[in-house]
């Protein structure tokens, strides 16, 4: 990826996260701890922006001279219409999670898939050659699936309740010329069961299992998965979802959503400051913030 240093100037630099709601976001604690550790004169806040106010909020980035922002649910797709430019990867994903203000020109990027791959690399998990299954077809699934396809998985299956959305995603991956052709399966179908039985990596990109509905799961029978399978959940509240708990009880390697949160945040620094954020500091701060929430 091309790394560009922001040209923003001033006595202090203001950044933040746009979403609705964002009160429980761990991003402010994570980034502010990193700024302190690096001796940087910067601050990161949480901006609760209802969808009806999104265009005004984006204009406010220019007017107030913010260095940049992260973008989260429900704005990742809609925000693209209000930016001056969108990086090719973000356009392929169809979502933006990082915005940089370059002298009043707002450019959108997506670091979700990049952070996802780095979090697996950190755990020593090699993606290339694995059979991968992505559960879901929303914004997170799009970023994950694109990067899995580019990283050389042997097989990629998308399982989603809306088959049409899964097929749209598969078609977008084909247009992006990923080396592997994505397959689509309905939950509970024979095709889905066969893909899961041969999976080397399963990634939950749905909100199933997220607080407060912690007993929901995108996969009722973890016993279908082979012993070498890695189970990844992009949900990070709770840190161990029902899916991860059951996978761990079956002896499988598990990775929670905190890893992706931290790494996508550290990758955003590449665009804001021209260097990667301090992962260990960010992880410690994010974990403390999440554990301190009711």
UniProtKB/Swiss-Prot annotation:
InterPro entries: Aminoacid_DH-like_N_sf, NAD(P)-bd_dom_sf, SDH_C, Shikimate_DH, Shikimate_DH-bd_N, Shikimate_DH_fam, Shikm_DH/Glu-tRNA_Rdtase. Pathway: Metabolic intermediate biosynthesis; chorismate biosynthesis; chorismate from D-erythrose 4-phosphate and phosphoenolpyruvate: step 4/7. GO terms for biological process: amino acid biosynthetic process; aromatic amino acid family biosynthetic process; chorismate biosynthetic process; shikimate metabolic process. This is Shikimate dehydrogenase (NADP(+)). Its EC number is 1.1.1.25. Involved in the biosynthesis of the chorismate, which leads to the biosynthesis of aromatic amino acids. Catalyzes the reversible NADPH linked reduction of 3-dehydroshikimate (DHSA) to yield shikimate (SA). The active site is at residue 76. Homodimer. It catalyses: shikimate + NADP(+) = 3-dehydroshikimate + NADPH + H(+). Belongs to the shikimate dehydrogenase family. The lineage of its organism: Bacteria, Bacillati, Bacillota, Clostridia, Eubacteriales. One of its GO terms (molecular function) is NADP binding. The keyword Repeat does not apply. Shikimate binds at residues 25-27, 72, 97, 112, 236. NADP(+) binds at residues 136-140, 234, 257. It comes from the Bacteria. Keywords: Amino-acid biosynthesis, Aromatic amino acid biosynthesis, NADP, Oxidoreductase. It comes from Symbiobacterium thermophilum (strain DSM 24528 / JCM 14929 / IAM 14863 / T).
């Amino acid at each position: 990826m091309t790394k560009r240093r922001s040209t923003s100037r001033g006595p202090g630099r203001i950044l933040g996260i746009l979403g609705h709601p964002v009160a429980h976001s761990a991003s402010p604690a994570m980034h502010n701890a990193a700024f302190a550790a690096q001796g940087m004169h910067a601050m990161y806040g949480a901006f609760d922006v209802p969808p009806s106010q999104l265009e005004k909020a984006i204009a406010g980035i220019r007017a107030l001279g913010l260095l940049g922002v992260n973008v989260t649910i429900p704005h990742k797709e809609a925000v693209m219409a209000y930016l001056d430019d969108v990086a090719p990867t973000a356009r392929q994903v169809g979502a933006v999670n990082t915005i940089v203000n370059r002298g009043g020109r707002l450019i959108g990027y997506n670091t979700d898939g990049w952070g996802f791959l780095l979090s697996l690399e950190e755990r020593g998990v090699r993606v290339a050659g694995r059979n991968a299954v992505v559960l879901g077809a929303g914004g997170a699934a799009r970023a994950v699936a694109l990067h899995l396809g580019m990283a050389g998985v042997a097989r990629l299956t998308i399982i989603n309740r809306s088959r049409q959305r899964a097929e749209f995603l598969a078609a977008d991956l084909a247009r992006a010329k990923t080396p592997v052709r994505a397959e689509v399966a309905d939950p509970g179908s024979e095709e889905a069961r066969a893909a899961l039985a041969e999976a080397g990596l399963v990634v939950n990109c749905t909100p199933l299992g997220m607080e407060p509905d912690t007993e929901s799961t995108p996969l009722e029978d973890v016993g279908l998965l082979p012993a070498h399978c890695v189970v990844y959940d992009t949900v990070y509240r709770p840190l161990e979802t029902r899916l991860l708990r059951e996978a761990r009880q079956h002896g499988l390697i598990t990775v929670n959503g905190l890893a992706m949160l931290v790494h996508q945040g550290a990758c955003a620094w590449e665009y804001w400051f021209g260097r990667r954020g301090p992962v260990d500091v960010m992880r410690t701060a994010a974990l403390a913030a999440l554990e301190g929430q009711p």
